[in-house]
Amino acid sequence: MDLKSLIRDVPDFPKPGILFRDLTTLLQNQAGLRYVIDQLVEKHANAGIDYVAGIESRGFIFGAPLAYRLGAGFIPLRKPGKLCAPVYAVEYELEYGRDRLEMHQDAIEPGRRVLIVDDLIATGGTAAAAAGLIQKAQAELYGFAFIVELTDLAGRQKLPDVPITTLVTY
């Protein structure tokens, strides 16, 4: 399936000079959404994944059905202040400032195998922070799964040496 044909390009969003890859059009397409989840399941079905950790917010959209299909639990990796119990937190650099990801401290037992999922990898900062959360929990980072990779931004170079799955590259 040609996933690129299901992804809308939005020029100058969120600011001039940026070409935004809008996956909402992919999500609206029943066959496209099914194909994405089926592809991710096929690539990770035999990996012994205990948990899928989805990065807020579009990682939730793809991560939860993937976890269900893999027979794994789902862990939301949230922006600051969204979780109600004690958290692990990792700060990371943005183009203009800093941000933080958080995860409940009791979300993952040490040694459990985790796949991190997000819709897109660009510079890799958010995904690297997500990996830091898994490390703080003393769990095993199995790998990453992204629908889209923006290769010019070299985000995968910031990530640990684990399997990285992408379905579409630009």
From Swiss-Prot:
The keyword NADP does not apply. Pfam families: Pribosyltran. GO terms for biological process: adenine salvage; AMP salvage; purine ribonucleoside salvage. Pathway: Purine metabolism; AMP biosynthesis via salvage pathway; AMP from adenine: step 1/1. Its EC number is 2.4.2.7. Catalyzes a salvage reaction resulting in the formation of AMP, that is energically less costly than de novo synthesis. This is Adenine phosphoribosyltransferase. It comes from Thermosynechococcus vestitus (strain NIES-2133 / IAM M-273 / BP-1).
